[in-house]
């Protein structure tokens, strides 16, 4: 029995700025069958919030709890390790996911 689905996004549900055929059909089927699903992505160029906005614009209805991004996983890990100060070597937009940390080049506890 299938308990849940975990989907990659880029190339599976969309390419470039276009939703792929059948993307919403599978999600509607999963909702009808009450099978939970989540999305994962290794995209580090956009903060999670902007990525969700992009997906919604494309027609893929995604809420925050359904998306696990590489940046979000990094944030969760750093919080679990009780890191307070980090240096970010990321695109400017992606840095928004790390807003709860003290961002500093001086004596960082982690470099992302």
Go through each PLM region and give its residues.
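HAD-like aspartate-dependent phosphatase fold
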Residues: 1-9, 13-112
